Amino acid sequence: MLFRYLVWLFRFIEVKNVVSISLLVIGSNYLTTAISNNTSTTISPTTSSNYLLTAISNNTSTTILPTTTSSNYLTSAIPNIISDKEDDTPFSTDKTVSDGLSPITLYRAIRSTLNDTMTDILTRPYRPTTVIFHSDTPQPVKNATQGNIIKKTYRQVLTFFIQPNPLFPCFKNHEVFLNLANILNTILCIILIKNV
């Protein structure tokens, strides 16, 4: 289930006009895959004991905003400021967010999110935390209140997390989320996009 979730995660990374992509998978094994001249849209990273097929489609993806919570229920991480009716649009793969998030920023945000999750679990196991980030900042912005596009996408992603989905079980226990964080930390990827 967790690896199916990872497939879903990487499928929504927005990639446009890519000439060359270098994918570095951090784990027990290292694999570098290059895509040149826009002739392929499939990346297949490999870990030591599992195989993960990742498809990145041009102009059809939605940027993923990582979220983290150390409380027992993920719903507690939804701020009241983004509970407007216009933000309750169901999550759809057809919607493209024009935020222009760079892969390096995504990598830093994921790493920071995982670090915050580890710290919160060990020292403050019941304090809810939300992490979202802007494309023009090198690090995540905690409890951000500006940016309608970011808030709307954040709401959509959280809604997709909470509702039952066959891809992965609902994250209602912080231990389950921590296990996912450990897996992500093991196969954390740096995606380098050149000539975008």
Swiss-Prot record:
Record keywords = Late protein, Repeat
Q: Which domain of life is it from?
A: Viruses
Q: Where are the sequence repeats?
A: 28-48, 49-70, 71-92
Q: Does the keyword Hydrolase apply?
A: no
Q: What induces it?
A: Expressed in the late phase of the viral replicative cycle.
UniProt entry tagged with the keyword Lyase: no
- Tell me which family the UniProt entry assigns to this protein: Belongs to the asfivirus I196L family.
Name of this chain's protein: Late protein I196L
